[in-house]
């Protein structure tokens, strides 16, 4: 993983290239159709959680913190073991972890399928294999981690729906996988985009995602 200091250095040197890639990243994903299959929730249903991975967790966390119905979004690691759930180890790309975000949401206000629609439209590019933007490695892979059979059913059905509709010009590489556990990332990673809005990495890679969310999903933006 490219560390924070390295990221800043790269984006200072290649500012114009980063600006171009930022606009490309924010505009590349089409607005996707709603999922034909979704979860159900009775009035007064308890809060639920979803875990997704797709590139650096800073930007995905920031996106979902701007979505109505989301109670919290937490950066962390999923796919590996507790022993390797540490930034310096995960960043080596030698663990089974992916940088992930756990989303706690109110299912009476937003559905699991709607969260996936946001994730696949503005959260990241689901056609990028083991990378997102300037970040490369298996720890940046695109994954929907499911907690139960209903989440698995919704995720697999939605990806199949998008493939059949040829919603993207390239094949979708997002995997659907069971969630063994979610491990919260170090404190300095939490709310990084909100706390460091002028960080060049945030400015050129993550802030445009929030703008895209506001433009394409005004009914969900807060």
Task: Describe the residue ranges of each PLM region.
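Flexible coil/turn and secondary-structure edge motifs
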Residues: 2-5, 17, 21-222
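N-terminal export leaders
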Residues: 6-11
């Amino acid at each position: 993983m490219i560390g924070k200091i390295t990221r800043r250095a790269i984006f200072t040197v290649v500012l114009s290239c980063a600006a171009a890639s930022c606009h490309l990243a924010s505009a590349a994903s089409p607005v996707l159709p709603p999922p034909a299959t979704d979860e159900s929730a009775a009035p007064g249903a308890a809060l639920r959680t979803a875990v997704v991975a797709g590139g650096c967790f800073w930007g995905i966390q920031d996106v979902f913190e701007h979505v109505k119905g989301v109670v919290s979004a937490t950066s962390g690691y999923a796919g590996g073991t507790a022993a390797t759930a540490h930034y310096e180890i995960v960043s080596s790309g030698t663990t089974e972890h992916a940088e992930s975000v756990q989303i706690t949401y109110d299912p009476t206000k937003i559905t699991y399928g709607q969260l996936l629609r946001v994730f696949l439209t503005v959260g990241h590019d689901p056609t990028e294999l083991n990378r997102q933007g300037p970040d490369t490695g298996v720890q940046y892979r695109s994954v929907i981690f499911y907690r139960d059979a209903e989440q698995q059913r919704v995720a697999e059905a939605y990806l199949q729906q998008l493939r059949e509709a040829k919603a993207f010009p390239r094949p979708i590489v997002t995997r659907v996988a069971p969630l063994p556990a979610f491990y919260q990332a170090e404190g300095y990673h939490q709310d990084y985009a909100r706390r460091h809005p002028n960080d060049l990495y945030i400015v050129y890679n993550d802030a445009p995602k929030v703008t895209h969310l506001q433009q394409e999903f005004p009914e969900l933006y807060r």
